[in-house]
């Protein structure tokens, strides 16, 4: 090899990102600064540990490993087998399940795998309506689940925004679905897993629980577990579980476990993302520690505090409060749309998302509400006092926005709140080792 070729190879293995691609480096640096200086209230987001970051950014990204531990289609898998087996065993221990598949690349793909394993195109299934707090993959007409299968939606009661279990039972008996999905992305109350299973058993249907939003709370013991009741449980590994982005499928049924494994590979995916599976394993181990129970309890306490303080400030909370990590704020009485609220709060460095509320008359691009969540800020160390202050900051901005004639009329309030946000976030630094990079 020539000296020039040798130098090129050395640079390939040793030059850092800032040297190789300054545009991407700057964008990542900008995102780090955004996360450091903004209050993250998006309920589906969290902040992972340095250990999770290191596992995901490791040399495992180089390795192809089609198949499952001990049954790979490639050589050189002795170490990735160790990693995947650790992830499987930790997931089983964490949730008390007999079988676990850790290969799903995303929440959508894990749910698609269940559909592939249990249903045929055109089969009927039931899921929570999107406006009632459901998820796209639970039967939305714009999603594969609603395009390839006959989707029957159930919802919440108009008078209290709680799940209408009588309607669930009535619809199940009327339509005889092969699958019933429980779980959602914007429902703030406890789920009656036992009742869902009774309804499923009565009509001979499978029960799938998608606990993506509450998995960390289940792991921490502050939310009832669906694992003893559901035929299959799916969850993303980020959100309240505080791991990398990805999916996890659990079951206590060996026959269903085999169907799920075949649906993931070779049904939907090829080689698994071993660097992500390693990060999942790390996150599962973190969630098995006693301190995670404290974290989960704090997540719920902080969400309750946020909801109660906003209520005291005159805001309407869907269903009257929360039992988990999230809350939906109905903004109609404030004469503000979800879209305008999201933008105004964003300008003050409080990040949330516009969200439809039950029986919403606005489009999903406008909405009548916002969704707020406590996991990420709780990870930073925010406690109930901080969440009380956050509620007051939100109130300042949105109360004034409702009276303002334009965004410019709200700018002075947003500037004052942005300074308060800066003072608060500076007290809770992220990844201090990165500040010197």
Curated annotation (Swiss-Prot):
Family matches, as Pfam families: SHMT
Pathway: One-carbon metabolism; tetrahydrofolate interconversion; Amino-acid biosynthesis; glycine biosynthesis; glycine from L-serine: step 1/1
Disulfide pattern: none
Keyword field contains Transferase: yes
CDD domains named among the record's database cross-references: SHMT
Record's GO cellular component terms: cytosol
GO biological process, one term: glycine biosynthetic process from serine
Catalytic activity: (6R)-5,10-methylene-5,6,7,8-tetrahydrofolate + glycine + H2O = (6S)-5,6,7,8-tetrahydrofolate + L-serine
Binding site for (6S)-5,6,7,8-tetrahydrofolate: 130, 134-136, 363-365
Gene Ontology molecular function: glycine hydroxymethyltransferase activity; pyridoxal phosphate binding
Site, as annotated: Plays an important role in substrate specificity: 238
EC number: 2.1.2.1
Keyword line: Amino-acid biosynthesis, Cytoplasm, One-carbon metabolism, Pyridoxal phosphate, Transferase
Matching InterPro entries: PyrdxlP-dep_Trfase (IPR015424), PyrdxlP-dep_Trfase_major (IPR015421), PyrdxlP-dep_Trfase_small (IPR015422), Ser_HO-MeTrfase (IPR001085), Ser_HO-MeTrfase-like (IPR049943), Ser_HO-MeTrfase_PLP_BS (IPR019798), SHMT-like_dom (IPR039429)
Residues bearing the modification N6-(pyridoxal phosphate)lysine: 239
Subcellular location: Cytoplasm
Cofactors (names): pyridoxal 5'-phosphate
Top-level division of the source organism's lineage: Bacteria
Main location: cytoplasm
Family per record: Belongs to the SHMT family.
NCBIfam families linked: PRK00011.1 (NF000586)
Subunit structure and binding partners: Homodimer.
Entry function: Catalyzes the reversible interconversion of serine and glycine with tetrahydrofolate (THF) serving as the one-carbon carrier. This reaction serves as the major source of one-carbon groups required for the biosynthesis of purines, thymidylate, methionine, and other important biomolecules. Also exhibits THF-independent aldolase activity toward beta-hydroxyamino acids, producing glycine and aldehydes, via a retro-aldol mechanism.
Cross-referenced HAMAP family: SHMT
Protein name: Serine hydroxymethyltransferase
Native source species: Bartonella henselae (strain ATCC 49882 / DSM 28221 / CCUG 30454 / Houston 1)
Higher taxonomy: Bacteria, Pseudomonadati, Pseudomonadota, Alphaproteobacteria, Hyphomicrobiales
Gene: glyA
């Amino acid at each position: 090899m020539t000296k020039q070729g040798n130098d090129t190879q050395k640079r390939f293995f040793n030059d850092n990102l800032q040297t190789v691609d300054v545009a991407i480096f700057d964008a990542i640096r900008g995102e780090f600064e955004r996360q450091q200086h903004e209050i993250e209230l998006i309920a589906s987001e969290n902040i992972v540990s340095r250990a999770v970051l290191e596992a995901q950014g490791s040399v495992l990204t180089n390795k192809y490993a089609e198949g499952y531990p001990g049954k790979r289609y490639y050589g050189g898998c002795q170490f990735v087998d160790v990693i995947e087996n650790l992830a499987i065993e930790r997931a089983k221990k964490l949730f008390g399940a007999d079988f676990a598949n850790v290969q799903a690349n995303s929440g959508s793909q894990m749910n698609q795998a269940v559909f592939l394993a249990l249903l045929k195109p055109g089969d009927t299934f039931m899921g929570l309506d999107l406006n009632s707090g459901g998820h796209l993959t639970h039967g939305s007409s714009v999603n594969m689940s609603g395009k390839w299968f006959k989707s029957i939606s159930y919802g919440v009661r108009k008078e209290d925004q709680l799940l209408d279990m009588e309607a669930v039972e009535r619809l199940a008996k009327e339509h005889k679905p092969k699958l019933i999905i429980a779980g959602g992305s914007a429902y703030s109350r406890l789920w009656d897993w036992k009742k869902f299973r009774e309804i499923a058993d009565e009509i001979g249907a499978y029960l799938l629980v998608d606990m993506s939003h509450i998995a960390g709370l289940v792991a921490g013991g502050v939310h009832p577990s669906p694992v003893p009741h559901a035929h299959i449980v799916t969850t993303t590994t980020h959100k309240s579980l505080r791991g990398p982005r990805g999916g996890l499928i659990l079951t206590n049924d060996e026959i269903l476990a085999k169907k799920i494994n075949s649906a993931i590979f070779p049904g939907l995916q090829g080689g698994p993302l071993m660097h992500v599976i390693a990060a999942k394993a790390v996150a599962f181990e973190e969630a098995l520690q006693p301190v995670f129970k404290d974290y989960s309890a704090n997540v719920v306490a902080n969400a309750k505090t946020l909801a109660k303080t906003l209520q005291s400030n005159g805001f309407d909370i869907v269903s009257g409060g929360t039992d988990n990590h999230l809350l939906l704020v109905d903004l109609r009485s404030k004469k503000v749309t979800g879209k305008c609220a999201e933008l105004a709060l964003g300008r003050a460095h409080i990040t949330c998302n516009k969200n439809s509320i039950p029986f919403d008359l606005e489009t999903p691009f406008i909405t009548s509400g916002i969704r707020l969540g406590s996991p990420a800020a709780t990870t930073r160390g925010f406690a109930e006092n901080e969440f009380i202050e956050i509620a007051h900051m939100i109130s300042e901005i949105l109360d004034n926005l409702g009276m303002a004639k334009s965004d410019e009329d709200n700018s002075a309030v947003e500037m004052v709140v942005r300074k308060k946000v800066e003072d608060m976030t500076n007290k809770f630094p992220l990844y201090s080792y990165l500040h010197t990079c």
